[in-house]
């Protein structure tokens, strides 16, 4: 099991999701549905709190099992929920995975997704031993 990271570049911070994140993550996702629907299979017009709560529950379990690492993307200064980044489909033989991310629409154009991807990739390389 990997310990909970707090990864930051002083602009954003990545951390594990907690049950208390349900409302903030739901608000970020709902705000961004128009942008997310074409790209994220989970995004749909009725996406809401119950699905977010289930997501947070499941990613807690898959984190503990070492199968899927989802991280909250937050503002490093005030903790505002900005989106999510994940390492999935981890291949233990070849030491690689998929990296996915999204950031809330109201913060688009500030380089947050690139920052989140960079921090998550470093987590994969340094903590998970991926190539």
Please tell me what each predicted stretch does.
Residues 1-106:
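GNAT-family acyltransferases
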Residues 33, 56, 120-128:
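Generic helix-packing signal
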Residues 101-103, 109-126:
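Conserved acetyl-CoA-binding loop-helix of GNAT-fold acetyltransferases
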Residues 131:
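Short acidic/polar active-site loop segments enriched in Thr and Asp
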